């Protein structure tokens, strides 16, 4: 089990650093109060997660690799706590419509993307 824990640790580090890069890029590309960087990180994480879940679906002997990529990388790359904080800050600033839009787009788009990529990746 120590190999699995180490894999999660390493994957989580790479995922977190990648999320930070996406957040910085989103902020530079879009001049908006909407938290684009967090949304992009969550959407990309769902794409990666959907692909990986389908690829590893029947792979019983890939425990460390699944831990590295699914639990570690995707866990570090997705940003539910950041999403929640940004939504709360929008609400505190009185920007209720932007906060509601953030919740709606983030949840529906992530669920849709995850579904599509799980289905598409089964074909590969």
Regions found by a protein language model. Name each.
Residues 1-124:
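Membrane-interface helix-loop junctions in multi-pass transporters/channels
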């Amino acid at each position: 089990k120590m190999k699995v824990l180490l894999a999660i640790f390493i994957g989580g580090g790479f995922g977190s650093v990648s999320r930070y890069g996406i957040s910085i890029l989103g902020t530079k590309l879009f001049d908006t109060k909407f938290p684009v960087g967090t949304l992009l990180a969550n959407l990309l994480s769902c794409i990666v997660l959907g692909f990986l879940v389908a690829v590893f679906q029947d792979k019983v002997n890939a425990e460390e690799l699944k831990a590295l990529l699914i639990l570690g990388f995707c866990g570090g790359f997705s940003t539910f706590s950041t999403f929640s904080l940004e939504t709360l800050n929008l609400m505190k600033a009185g920007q209720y419509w932007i906060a509601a839009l953030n919740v709606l787009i983030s949840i529906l788009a992530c669920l849709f993307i995850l579904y599509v990529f799980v289905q598409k990746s089964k074909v590969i």
